[in-house]
């Protein structure tokens, strides 16, 4: 199993080119199933989850070509299979997004119940009940969700009992080829939903209201080819801003938009960081100052993103003062805290809240990653700890951060990937 060896403490400073957003690329890739003509996508990140999505699409009969510049050509005009198999789906919960476009275009689809990060219950119930309201017939059989429809899906008014990014995207995809109009109420508002809507509209869909809590989709009989540029990854952006903030550095994130990160930037400024923005970049300068502790409460967009909670837990671990970090989106998303405590952090978990008393210096340790965002916080902790830190189970990082060690080295980190031999693991 691969691990990272990280040496510290080092100041992390420089310029980082931000990759395309994983959380936009995945639904957009699955949405290509809807198109009867070829699609061209740019700024597609090179990630394990993207590779898994390619494998699922190819299993369905989609033709995919990718060049060295991240341009992906996709042709879904000759899909002949309608099953996303367990051996691929088990590693990635986003695989459920294959179901809606399959049943919308081909009136049938099967997806194995998905896997992914182990951070609490992420049921697919809202995906299923929404499709049923649009006329799909759903069966759960031997670990598979099977959806069929007698002809086109029907437009419907769908109220989301809980704000759900995944279910909002599923309904939006399904509704593009449904008969009549669909209205999603209490819809998620994330920037990745807006980007997916832009992509679908470029294919000929008619979607309005994306980015608000009410989205309207007027169904079309067919969708065509298009070109689309994947939006920049706001979570990668926020992660590198935190990297500078905890290490006394100065960093510029290029090719990214500040308006997708308002809550994060506000908290960084509250922590005493100087943050300046341009149309396509964000710069954070610590001025050599230790961050001040900030209280965090995760919320659906435009609130503070749950995918930045682990990084800000680390920031608060080395900040001046005491903070409260409340996680309202997912269960079990504090699994990084015991690992940070092994490195000398002082954090206690009380229900869905962590109380963190900042320390001046972290210590090196052997730690284990438990999910994507927790794992990057442990790597960054190693960058500022005094000595050598080993981070195990780094496959989580490869699911969501493109070329992470190369990018970290460019801003001053001392990090290497290695594979522990079987004999040394015994």
Swiss-Prot record:
<feature type="modified residue" description="2-(S-cysteinyl)pyruvic acid O-phosphothioketal">
    <location>
        <position position="117"/>
    </location>
</feature>
<dbReference type="InterPro" id="IPR001986">
    <property type="entry name" value="Enolpyruvate_Tfrase_dom"/>
</dbReference>
<feature type="binding site">
    <location>
        <begin position="162"/>
        <end position="165"/>
    </location>
    <ligand>
        <name>UDP-N-acetyl-alpha-D-glucosamine</name>
    </ligand>
</feature>
<dbReference type="GO" id="GO:0051301">
    <property type="term" value="P:cell division"/>
</dbReference>
<feature type="binding site">
    <location>
        <position position="329"/>
    </location>
    <ligand>
        <name>UDP-N-acetyl-alpha-D-glucosamine</name>
    </ligand>
</feature>
<feature type="active site" description="Proton donor">
    <location>
        <position position="117"/>
    </location>
</feature>
<dbReference type="InterPro" id="IPR036968">
    <property type="entry name" value="Enolpyruvate_Tfrase_sf"/>
</dbReference>
<keyword id="KW-0573">Peptidoglycan synthesis</keyword>
<keyword id="KW-0963">Cytoplasm</keyword>
<dbReference type="GO" id="GO:0019277">
    <property type="term" value="P:UDP-N-acetylgalactosamine biosynthetic process"/>
</dbReference>
<feature type="binding site">
    <location>
        <position position="307"/>
    </location>
    <ligand>
        <name>UDP-N-acetyl-alpha-D-glucosamine</name>
    </ligand>
</feature>
<feature type="binding site">
    <location>
        <position position="93"/>
    </location>
    <ligand>
        <name>UDP-N-acetyl-alpha-D-glucosamine</name>
    </ligand>
</feature>
<dbReference type="GO" id="GO:0005737">
    <property type="term" value="C:cytoplasm"/>
</dbReference>
<keyword id="KW-0131">Cell cycle</keyword>
<keyword id="KW-0133">Cell shape</keyword>
<comment type="pathway">
    <text>Cell wall biogenesis; peptidoglycan biosynthesis.</text>
</comment>
<comment type="similarity">
    <text>Belongs to the EPSP synthase family. MurA subfamily.</text>
</comment>
<dbReference type="GO" id="GO:0008760">
    <property type="term" value="F:UDP-N-acetylglucosamine 1-carboxyvinyltransferase activity"/>
</dbReference>
<protein>
    <recommendedName>
        <fullName>UDP-N-acetylglucosamine 1-carboxyvinyltransferase</fullName>
        <ecNumber>2.5.1.7</ecNumber>
    </recommendedName>
</protein>
<dbReference type="InterPro" id="IPR013792">
    <property type="entry name" value="RNA3'P_cycl/enolpyr_Trfase_a/b"/>
</dbReference>
<keyword id="KW-0132">Cell division</keyword>
<keyword id="KW-0670">Pyruvate</keyword>
<feature type="binding site">
    <location>
        <begin position="22"/>
        <end position="23"/>
    </location>
    <ligand>
        <name>phosphoenolpyruvate</name>
    </ligand>
</feature>
<dbReference type="GO" id="GO:0009252">
    <property type="term" value="P:peptidoglycan biosynthetic process"/>
</dbReference>
<dbReference type="InterPro" id="IPR050068">
    <property type="entry name" value="MurA_subfamily"/>
</dbReference>
<dbReference type="GO" id="GO:0008360">
    <property type="term" value="P:regulation of cell shape"/>
</dbReference>
<comment type="function">
    <text>Cell wall formation. Adds enolpyruvyl to UDP-N-acetylglucosamine.</text>
</comment>
<keyword id="KW-0961">Cell wall biogenesis/degradation</keyword>
<dbReference type="Pfam" id="PF00275">
    <property type="entry name" value="EPSP_synthase"/>
</dbReference>
<dbReference type="GO" id="GO:0071555">
    <property type="term" value="P:cell wall organization"/>
</dbReference>
<keyword id="KW-0808">Transferase</keyword>
<dbReference type="InterPro" id="IPR005750">
    <property type="entry name" value="UDP_GlcNAc_COvinyl_MurA"/>
</dbReference>
């Amino acid at each position: 199993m691969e691990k990272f060896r990280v040496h510290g403490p080092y100041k992390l400073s420089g310029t980082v080119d931000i990759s395309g957003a994983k959380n936009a690329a995945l639904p957009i890739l699955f949405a290509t199933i809807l198109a009867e003509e070829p699609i061209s996508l740019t700024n597609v990140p090179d990630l394990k989850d993207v590779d898994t999505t390619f494998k699922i699409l190819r299993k369905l009969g989609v033709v995919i070509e990718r060049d060295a510049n991240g341009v992906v050509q996709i042709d879904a005009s000759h899909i002949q299979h309608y099953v996303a198999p367990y051996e691929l789906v088990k590693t990635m919960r986003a695989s459920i997004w294959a179901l809606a476009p399959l049943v919308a275009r081909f009136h049938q689809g099967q997806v194995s119940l998905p896997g992914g990060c182990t951070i609490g219950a992420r049921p697919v119930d809202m995906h299923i009940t929404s499709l049923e309201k649009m006329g799909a017939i759903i069966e759960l059989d031997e670990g598979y969700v099977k959806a069929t429809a007698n002809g086109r899906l029907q437009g419907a008014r769908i109220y989301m009992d809980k704000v759900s990014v995944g279910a909002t995207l599923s309904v939006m995809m399904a509704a593009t080829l449904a008969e009549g109009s669909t209205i999603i109420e209490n819809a998620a508002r994330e920037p990745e939903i807006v980007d997916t809507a832009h992509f679908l509209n470029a294919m000929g869909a008619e979607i309005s209201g994306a980015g608000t809590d009410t989205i309207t989709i007027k169904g079309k009989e067919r969708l065509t080819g298009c070109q689309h540029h994947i939006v920049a990854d706001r979570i990668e952006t926020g992660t590198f801003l935190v990297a500078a903030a905890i290490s006394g550095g100065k960093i510029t994130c290029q090719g990214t938009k500040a308006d997708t990160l308002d809550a994060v930037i506000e908290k960084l400024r509250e922590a005493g960081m100087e943050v300046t923005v341009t149309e396509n970049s964000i710069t954070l300068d610590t001025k050599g100052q230790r961050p001040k502790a900030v209280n965090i409460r995760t919320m659906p967009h435009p609130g503070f993103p749950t995918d930045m909670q682990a990084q800000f837990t680390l920031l608060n671990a080395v900040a001046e003062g005491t903070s409260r970090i409340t996680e309202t989106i997912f269960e079990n998303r504090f699994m990084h805290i015991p690992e940070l405590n092994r490195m000398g952090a002082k954090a206690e978990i009380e229900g869905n809240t962590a109380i963190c008393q900042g320390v001046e210096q972290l210590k090196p340790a052997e730690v284990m990653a438990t999910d994507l965002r927790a794992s990057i916080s442990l790597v960054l902790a190693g960058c500022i700890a005094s000595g050598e830190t080993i981070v195990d189970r780094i496959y989580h990082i490869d699911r969501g951060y493109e070329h992470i060690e190369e990018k970290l080295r460019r801003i001053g980190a001392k990090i290497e990937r290695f594979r522990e031999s079987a004999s040394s693991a015994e």
